[in-house]
Design a protein with these regions (language model features):
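Mixed-charge, glycine-accented linear interaction segment located at domain edges/termini
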Residues: 119-179
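Short, acidic/charged, Gly/Pro-enriched secondary-structure junctions
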Residues: 84-114
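Beta-strand elements of well-folded, non-transmembrane domains
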Residues: 72-78, 96-102, 116-122, 142-147
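Solvent-exposed edge beta-strands and adjacent loop segments
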Residues: 10-79, 117-128, 169-178
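Short, small-residue-biased leader/transition segments that mark boundaries at the very start
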Residues: 1-9
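Well-ordered beta-strand positions in beta-sheet-rich domains
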Residues: 69, 111-115, 137
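Short amphipathic beta-strand/extended segments with alternating polar/hydrophobic composition
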Residues: 31-38, 106-118, 156-159
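Solvent-exposed loop and beta-edge segments used for protein-protein assembly and interaction
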Residues: 62-66, 86-90, 132-134
Length: 179
């Protein structure tokens, strides 16, 4: 039986095991536009620069981010697809539930949300094949990306307002203070 600091050490070695995504929904302007779809959220990749240091040292520049892109693959040609494709700036809210296995062996369902400010990158080519469903991928140029897991903000990246906040630390704060 572990007690005191031994127990704290053991408990600190456990991470909740994040399981499968159970379901997802997509909203634009508070209106449901898609359900149980495949979503690719943006990668956030800092621009890099080369420095001379015993040759070349390549490091990220935390004030510059490569273009962010997201995609949603939706079944069917419907009003939800039309609303996603409108060629105007929009905020897309994505909600999903995931299974989590906890240290005591119990399972809980955890809610996650992502908010994207984006514009459609175009109208996708539609697949129309008798006897098969129409699967269509909408892609978006993203300027703002915010992620919440279990009610806690994980990150907020806002290229237009120079915000790069990860885990509560704003890495662009010093840049904004000088501008």
């Amino acid at each position: 039986r572990l007690v005191g600091s031994e127990m704290c050490i053991r408990d600190s070695l456990w991470l909740d095991l994040k399981g499968p995504i159970l379901a997802d929904t997509v909203y634009i302007g508070g209106t449901l536009v898609a359900k149980d779809v495949t979503i690719s959220l943006p990668a956030v990749t800092p621009v890099t620069a080369d420095f001379k240091a015993m040759g070349t040292y390549t490091a990220p520049i935390l004030g510059q981010i490569e273009a962010m892109e997201a995609s949603i693959t939706k079944i069917g040609i419907d009003l939800g697809l039309r609303n996603m494709i409108k060629l105007e700036s929009k905020t897309i809210e994505i909600r999903w539930a995931q299974d989590v296995k906890q240290a005591d062996g119990s399972t809980k369902t955890e809610g996650c949300k992502a908010f994207l400010r984006c514009v459609s990158k175009g109208i996708p080519g539609l697949s129309v094949d008798p006897g098969n469903t129409s699967e269509n991928e909408a892609t978006f140029a993203v300027s703002r990306y915010q992620l919440y897991v279990g009610g806690a903000e994980y990150w907020l990246i806002d290229q237009l307002n120079t915000i790069l906040r990860v885990g509560g630390v704003d890495y662009a704060k010093d840049i904004r203070s000088l501008l």
